[in-house]
């Protein structure tokens, strides 16, 4: 075997690990099923010159100096602040919900009272989760939380995950907190930016290093075999270290059953207008079918001579063999699914030359910065192994 490592998947996790290993002198082959690198962050320029993200909106944001210093080696960071809205009962309100939301749905006297109670009961905190507010001892706080839960969280969860809120892992409901101020940005991290030339360009620079070769349009699973007697994974019948970033259940032929993932379908529309909506992303929890609309001329701001590009986003059940919905985007985190994943994880640990990393392989709902940090930390633990 001419390679020291086979890396399955050319997304962030695979690309970063390939780069770090190549810098240490290893020979790497990246095998990617799709016809492009960059995973779900892949972007392209449409016919009107608009940079569009094929698999939905991504923004780099992190509080980690390590992540920022690493990733900005491969891109020119353009400062950006994500702004989102949600449409509730026909009213566009900031998302995450903030004090403006209270002003929009309460009269001035009750709004002032509720804002004061929130500040008194969560002192010094910039935000609070709807889960915490639903458990509050203050009736007015509970009522407001219930209003938001019924009008947004519950409906959005049902569409996004095809589950009721009580079925999903609480961490999912906590991803979008309620802001205890008039702050109207989606993230409040130390760093938030977009790569000036796009995510595909950034990923290309990551893997552009001596010792890295890339195969696109190749399903690595057609070349991988599992030998339980030797506790070894083979690639084209040869033993080689394999870093796998795909779906762990698929790797092992669904030996312990299928893990649930959600997929997405996008309806992209080029529109002859300067602006379609107020902000980059608008959520529609009460609308049937789609969950949100992304306007890409606002991610980041792009002036494209009277044209814009919007994407209606429809969550659907993942099915590898379907015409649409055949890309796994999100692991569906429930108590049952996580127990099943742990069975796969324990089984995978038997194979000495197999390393797992990434949202699908780790069965975790990672943000981009978490994937970057996970790959860097994993590499550090591999130093003796490499």
Model region roles, listed by residue range:
Residues 24, 221-347:
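Mid-domain catalytic core of redox enzymes
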Residues 3-30, 379:
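N-terminal Rossmann-like FAD-binding beta1-loop-alpha1 element of flavoenzymes
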Residues 89-94, 100-238:
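Active-site/ligand-binding neighborhood in enzyme catalytic cores
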Residues 22-47:
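Glycine-rich FAD pyrophosphate-binding loop
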